[in-house]
Every structure is written in structure tokens, then in C-alpha cells.
Amino acid sequence: IGMVVECKDGYLMGPDGCKRGCLTRPARYCPNECSRLKGKDGYCYLWLACYCYNMPESAPVWERATNRCGKGK
């Protein structure tokens, strides 16, 4: 009997609704943050934002369709 686990990839999102930046962060910042949220791995995309792989469906990731960065709460 198999079990299907839904996962998603995407940019980590901060409490302000913006992508989580990584330009001035230590090298392992993004992989550590992705792991903390139960993602498999991650990296600093173009030294601008953390991108994570295999995140649980419940993890908040930035999406263009629901972008609220810079738009208040």
C-alpha cells in the first residue's frame, strides 16, 4: 500500500508577504530555513531570495497570484 505525500517548491515568504531575502545572509541560511519548515533542501536564488524544494503543502511560499508584498497587511 503506497502513500502519496503532496509537496511543493517555492520561495520562502516572510511575515510581510515578501520573498525571504538572502543577499546578506550566511551561506547555509536558506537550506537551514527550508529544513526548519520541513522542506527537503533549498538555496539562495541569484543571491536574492530563498527557494525551497519539497515543502509541505501547509508551508507559506510566495506566489505571484496571491502576492501581498508591499501592500500592507
From Swiss-Prot:
Beta toxins bind voltage-independently at site-4 of sodium channels (Nav) and shift the voltage of activation toward more negative potentials thereby affecting sodium channel activation and promoting spontaneous and repetitive firing. It is found in: Secreted. The modification Lysine amide is found at residue 71. The keyword Cytoplasm does not apply. Negative results: does not affect the cardiac Nav1.5/SCN5A, the peripheral nerve channel Nav1.7/SCN9A, and the voltage-gated potassium channel Kv1.5/KCNA5. InterPro entries: LCN-type_CS_alpha_beta_dom, Scorpion_toxin-like_sf, Scorpion_toxinL, Scorpion_toxinL/defensin. Its main location: secreted. SUPFAM superfamilies: Scorpion toxin-like. Keywords: Amidation, Disulfide bond, Ion channel impairing toxin, Neurotoxin, Secreted, Signal, Toxin, Voltage-gated sodium channel impairing toxin. Expressed by the venom gland. GO terms for cellular component: extracellular region. GO terms for molecular function: sodium channel inhibitor activity; toxin activity. Has the structural arrangement of an alpha-helix connected to antiparallel beta-sheets by disulfide bonds (CS-alpha/beta). It holds the Pfam family Toxin_3. This is Toxin Td10. Disulfide bonds join 18-69, 22-44, 30-50, 34-52. Residues 1-7 form the signal peptide. Residues 8-70 form the LCN-type CS-alpha/beta domain. Belongs to the long (4 C-C) scorpion toxin superfamily. Sodium channel inhibitor family. Beta subfamily. It comes from Tityus discrepans. It comes from the Eukaryota.
